[in-house]
Structure formats: structure tokens, C-alpha cells
């Protein structure tokens, strides 16, 4: 297969989307179900692995082995308070392995333990395959988006997920910036404009303020919450309705994962309805212990249940505007991105906060990020199309970066909202006389003390010549590349000795061995998926052939052409096969193929005799000669 263009992937908490820039425009690619967004779900069963729509569609039947929300786990520690809170809502198992959260599922009769990176890589593989099916070409490179407020560990982990999926990750880029790109290119803006991107998705929330001027997109400031989105609103509805169920029926259904999952699906549907109606019904038949549950919820009640979360959405907006040191009135446009921005109350609060500013709803909130990522992928792979040749994106570091100095103080070297790529240096000294070395500990965050910030890594600089405290000069340099990934160097000026660290092999990150193992696992999963597809094909061919034979010998025209003995031979052979299929539906592909050959050996001569008599067509059909393959349903046709 020839190599295709680079693609842009919006890897979302709840849904993902993929786009490609070709023939001078962006195309958002629909999946095999015809949907332009794909659920970020992976499910494991006794016989197969499912990704996307197929996984989400069976979640009520298989809640404990259907994994979603991997983006809420990626790059975090197990004891992170947000993970501990989310675990109360997740039906799947999350375990602690060396301080990292790992996911467990039963697959083909054994327990699989997967990292969040592996689960995300499966979703990325699905998006890559969706693009390949559409383009008819092999896709090797992609730009993958992350929330602007993702920290270093979360960015690195997302990049690892891409590597496991067999993708050459051209760049990890910020979601709101890509949405601004979608808006700017769509509107063909002229003159300098200040644009606020308000991006509220299924699990994360970002605000970015940009200055857009003739194809130059400069991020001024960014703010957000990597743990706020539509899922949190669903949780409020689920809690509210499960308590109502308990009040009405004196039964607690919250211990039953399947009941909670079915209630969550109904709650999510109700939430969407409330964006356009004043009231929504939640109906679930036989929800728990045979009880049919029915309730209705008004938009006002929903807004009350989520009021604190909705108000929380304004804090990053305020922070982004304050950091940019511009007046609210100077904002020309507010662009809404992410499915949760469809909620009327959120729109109303945002509009009031910005003194009644009109909100721009002209771009598709579900597709804007993938659209911008596709443009970025084209730019990075050297596409010189007129539409994008003058586009320049200038992004910023979302969090301040620095090192720990005496007393656990955070000494910032790069302030938040500094343009990237960037370099900055500061000179430090020793804390005690004749100190032979220093330990450089790197942190990101806004707090004054390092204990309240996020530690990225550390390294030692040794061999400092003996000298009184305060005399040696140690220059510490930070260098952030275009992926937002950081390299730190420390150099002793008197001896010229230096040491450096690339903040990649952070203790929270996967080692190279882990990544290699996961790549092999991904290939094994794919091989198992392919084998399963071939097995089902072989089963369907056998079943189709048997039923074609059955209808051919039962046909009135055939009665006169077949001797009673021949008819009995065919009927018995067909019934034996159908009985065998009933009790061996999980047999191997080879067994199905063998059974098909046996059946053909027995019945083909008889059917040929019959058709020689009629001079009829030899096509695959009830009257025609039943073929080994085309007669039966194929795997694509059968749901």
C-alpha cells in the first residue's frame, strides 16, 4: 500500500476525531459506521477486542471489561485525588502498579493488565485505520492533540501512546490552538483580532486567548482544568437519579455496575436533550431487580445539580484574560469548542461574564480540533498549498518551570504563558562550603514551594572544585522544544563540567522496554483481531452454504430432479452441519473450513446432477448452485 498524507487526530476523553488536509481543504473522516466522531472506548470479550462504536454499543452487557476515560488516567499517579474520585464512577478495575494506575479486563479467559497509554494507543490505531480506509493509502505520520493545560508527563504519555500505535508522531499540540486555526482559516480574518477559545469537552477544559493577524496565530495565554467536562455533568445526573431510585424503591442499585452503566447512558441522552428542551425523560426498563425506572428532569434542576461546576468554567477564562493583561472589551470573538459548550447555561454564564459578547458558534465544536490538527500535520509534512503556506502558529508553555532551591523554594526559570519553543537560563550557587555537587530537581507549577508543584525529574552535577559557599557559579538552562518537551542543562562555570536531562524518562513514564513490549502486544492484539475476523468469515461461509443447500433441495422445482435417496443425503448432511454449528460456534477457522469442504464433497455432485437436469444457472442462490463463499453472509453484513 502506498504511503498517504499525514493526518490530524483529536484524541478525546469520550470521543475522538480524525482529519486530513488534501486538495486544498480539510476533510473530517467518517468511520466504518458513518460517524465523524468515534467513541474513545475499548472492550474485551471472551472472543474478541472491540474499539469505538462497537465497544460503546455493548457496554451495558459488559461494563467491567469496557474501558473508557483513558485520557483521565494518562500521565497521572494512582494516588492522584482526581483518579480516586473517578474510580467511584468507573465500572472497570483500576489497580496500583508502582504508583501508576493500570487497567484490568478479562480477555479470552485471562486477565489483561493494561496501561492508559496502551488503551489510548488502541483508540489511535482505530483512528489511523479509519483514515487509511478512506484514503486507500498507508498512514504513518500524525499530529495528536492534547489539552493546553496537560502537564509534561501527560504530554509524554500521549506521545508514547502514538508510538505504541505505530504512528510517527510529528507533534503533540494544544487543542484550543488547533480550534483557533480552524476558525481563522474558515473565516479568512483580516487585521489583528483577539480570539478567545472556550473548549469544554467530555473530560477536559481549556481556555486560550490568541492574537490572530494575517495567518499568524499567536497564543497569548492559556488556562484550564484537565479534569472538568461533560462526564462530570453525567456523574451529577447519575448520582441524583440513583438516589431517587433508592428513595422510591428502598433499594440501592449503585453496587451493580450494569445497572449504573444503563442509567449513565440514559442520563447522557437526557443531558443532550436538555440543551434543546426544557425537560427530558429518563426511562430504563428492568433497571435493577426487575424494576422499570422512569423519571423526568427539568433543565432548571439539571442546572442546579451542576451549578458549581458550571461556575468553575469561568475561573480559567478570568485567569487567561488577566494573564494577557487585556481588557475584556478588547476580545473580538469568543469561539465555542467541545460538545459540552452546547449547554445553554454555560453559554449564558460565559456571555454574561464577557459583558454580553456574542458567542461564535460557526465551527463544528466536535470537529474543530481535528480540523486544526489536520492543517498542522500538512504544514509539518511540507505541504505548500496556497491555503496554508502563510500560516504560522506560536504556542505557549501552560505552566511555569523551575528548580528547587534551598528550603524547598520554587525558583522559576520559565514563566507560564512564555512562547515555545524557548530557552532561558539562570545562575545559582552552592548552599554550603566545599560542596562537591548539586542536585538539580525540576518542577512545573505556580506555587511558591516545590512540594505543592509537580516534580518532573532530577539529575546530579558533581565534581565542583572546593570553594566557600556562594562562590561557585552554576548556570541552569531550560530549553523547551516545539512539542512542549523540555531539556535541562546545568554547567559549573569554573570547571566547565556539565550534565543534562531530557524530561522524558520521568518515573511516571513508560520505559523504552515497556513501550517495545506494548508495541509487540499491539501487534499481537491486531493479529488476534484479524484471526477472529477470518474465523467468523469461515463460520458464515459454512452456515450460508448449508442454508443455501437446504433451500435448494426444499424448492418445488428440485423435487422432480432429485431422487429421494439424494434428497435424504443432502438433508442429513445439512442438518448434521447445522447441529454441529449450534454446539461449536467458537470452533477454529480450520474446523469451519474442513466442515465446508466435507459438505461440498458430499453435496456438490448431487447438486450438479440436479442442475444438469434443469439447465439452470450455476450462480449462488436458492435455485442456483450454492457457492462456498458468496452465498452466505459475510462478516461485514452481519451485525
From Swiss-Prot:
Comp. bias (Gly residues): 613-632
Keywords: ATP-binding, Nucleotide-binding, Stress response
InterPro entries: ATPase_NBD (IPR043129), Heat_shock_70_CS (IPR018181), HSP70_C_sf (IPR029048), HSP70_peptide-bd_sf (IPR029047), Hsp_70_fam (IPR013126)
Domain of life: Eukaryota
Pfam family, one: HSP70
Annotated region (Disordered), positions in chain: 609-639
CDD domains reported for this sequence: ASKHA_NBD_HSP70_HSPA1
The name this protein goes by in its record: Heat shock 70 kDa protein IV
Species of the source: Paracentrotus lividus (Common sea urchin)
Amino acid at each position: 500500500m502506498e504511503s498517504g498524507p499525514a493526518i490530524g487526530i483529536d484524541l478525546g476523553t469520550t470521543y475522538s476525531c480524525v482529519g486530513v488536509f488534501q486538495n486544498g481543504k480539510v476533510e473530517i473522516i467518517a468511520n466504518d459506521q458513518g460517524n465523524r466522531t468515534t467513541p474513545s472506548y475499548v472492550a474485551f470479550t471472551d472472543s474478541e477486542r472491540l474499539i469505538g462504536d462497537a465497544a460503546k454499543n455493548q457496554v451495558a452487557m459488559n461494563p467491567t471489561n469496557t474501558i473508557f476515560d483513558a485520557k483521565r488516567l494518562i500521565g497521572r499517579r494512582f494516588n492522584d485525588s482526581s483518579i480516586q474520585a473517578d474510580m467511584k464512577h468507573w465500572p472497570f478495575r483500576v489497580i496500583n502498579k508502582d504508583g501508576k494506575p493500570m487497567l484490568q479486563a478479562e480477555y479470552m479467559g485471562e486477565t489483561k493488565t493494561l496501561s492508559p497509554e496502551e488503551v489510548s494507543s488502541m483508540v489511535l490505531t482505530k483512528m489511523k485505520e479509519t483514515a487509511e480506509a478512506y484514503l486507500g493509502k498507508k498512514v504513518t505520520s500524525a499530529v495528536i492533540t492534547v489539552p493546553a493545560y496537560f502537564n509534561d508527563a501527560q504530554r509524554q504519555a500521549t506521545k508514547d501512546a502514538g508510538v505504541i500505535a505505530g504512528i510517527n508522531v510529528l507533534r503533540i499540540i494544544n487543542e484550543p490552538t488547533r480550534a483557533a486555526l480552524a476558525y481563522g482559516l474558515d473565516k479568512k480574518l483580516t487585521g489583528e483580532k483577539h480570539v478567545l477559545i472556550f473548549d469544554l469537552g467530555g473530560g477536559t477544559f481549556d481556555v486560550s486567548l490568541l492574537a490572530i493577524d494575517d495567518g499568524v496565530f499567536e497564543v497569548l495565554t492559556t488556562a484550564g482544568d484537565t479534569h472538568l467536562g461533560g462526564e462530570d455533568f453525567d456523574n451529577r445526573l447519575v448520582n441524583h437519579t440513583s438516589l431517587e431510585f433508592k428513595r422510591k424503591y428502598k433499594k440501592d442499585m449503585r453496587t451493580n455496575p450494569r445497572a449504573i452503566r444503563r442509567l449513565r447512558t440514559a442520563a447522557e441522552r437526557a443531558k443532550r436533550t436538555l440543551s434543546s428542551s426544557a425537560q427530558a425523560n429518563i426511562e430504563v426498563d428492568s433497571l435493577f431487580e426487575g424494576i422499570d425506572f422512569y423519571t423526568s428532569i427539568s433543565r432548571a434542576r439539571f442546572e442546579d445539580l451542576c451549578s458549581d461546576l458550571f461556575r468553575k468554567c469561568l475561573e480559567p477564562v478570568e485567569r487567561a484574560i488577566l494573564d494577557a493583561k487585556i481588557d475584556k472589551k478588547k476580545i473580538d470573538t469568543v469561539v465555542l469548542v467541545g460538545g459540552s459548550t452546547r449547554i445553554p447555561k454555560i453559554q449564558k454564564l460565559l456571555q454574561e461574564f464577557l459583558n454580553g459578547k456574542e458567542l461564535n458558534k460557526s465551527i463544528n465544536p466536535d470537529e474543530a480540533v481535528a480540523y486544526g490538527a489536520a492543517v498542522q500535520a500538512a504544514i509539518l509534512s511540507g505541504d505548500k498549498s496556497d491555503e496554508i503556506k502563510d500560516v504560522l502558529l506560536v504556542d505557549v508553555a501552560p505552566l511555569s518551570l523551575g528548580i528547587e532551591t534551598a528550603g524547598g523554594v520554587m525558583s522559576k526559570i520559565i514563566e507560564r504563558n512564555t512562547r515555545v519553543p524557548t530557552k532561558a537560563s539562570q545562575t545559582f550557587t552552592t548552599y554550603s562550603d566545599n560542596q562537591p555537587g548539586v542536585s538539580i530537581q525540576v518542577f512545573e507549577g505556580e506555587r511558591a514551594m516545590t512540594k505543592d508543584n509537580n516534580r518532573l525529574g532530577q539529575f546530579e552535577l558533581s565534581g565542583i572544585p572546593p570553594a566557600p559557599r556562594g562562590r561557585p557559579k552554576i548556570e541552569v538552562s531550560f530549553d523547551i522544544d516545539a512539542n512542549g518537551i523540555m531539556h535541562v542543562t546545568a554547567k559549573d562555570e569554573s570547571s566547565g563540567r556539565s550534565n543534562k536531562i531530557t524530561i522524558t524518562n520521568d518515573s511516571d513514564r513508560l520505559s523504552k522496554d515497556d513501550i517495545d513490549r506494548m508495541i509487540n502486544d499491539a501487534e499481537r492484539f491486531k493479529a488476534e483481531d484479524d484471526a477472529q475476523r477470518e474465523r467468523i468469515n469461515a463460520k458464515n461461509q459454512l452456515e450460508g452454504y448449508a442454508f443455501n443447500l437446504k433451500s435448494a433441495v426444499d424448492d418445488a422445482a428440485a423435487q422432480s430432479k432429485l431422487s429421494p435417496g439424494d434428497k435424504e443425503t443432502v438433508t442429513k448432511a445439512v442438518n448434521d452441519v447445522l447441529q454441529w454449528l449450534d454446539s461449536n460456534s467458537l470452533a477454529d477457522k480450520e474446523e469451519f473450513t474442513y466442515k465446508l469442504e466435507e459438505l461440498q464433497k458430499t453435496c456438490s455432485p448431487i447438486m450438479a446432477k440436479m442442475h444438469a437436469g434443469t439447465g439452470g444457472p450455476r450462480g449462488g442462490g436458492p435455485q442456483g448452485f450454492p457457492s462456498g463463499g458468496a452465498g452466505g453472509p459475510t462478516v461485514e453484513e452481519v451485525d
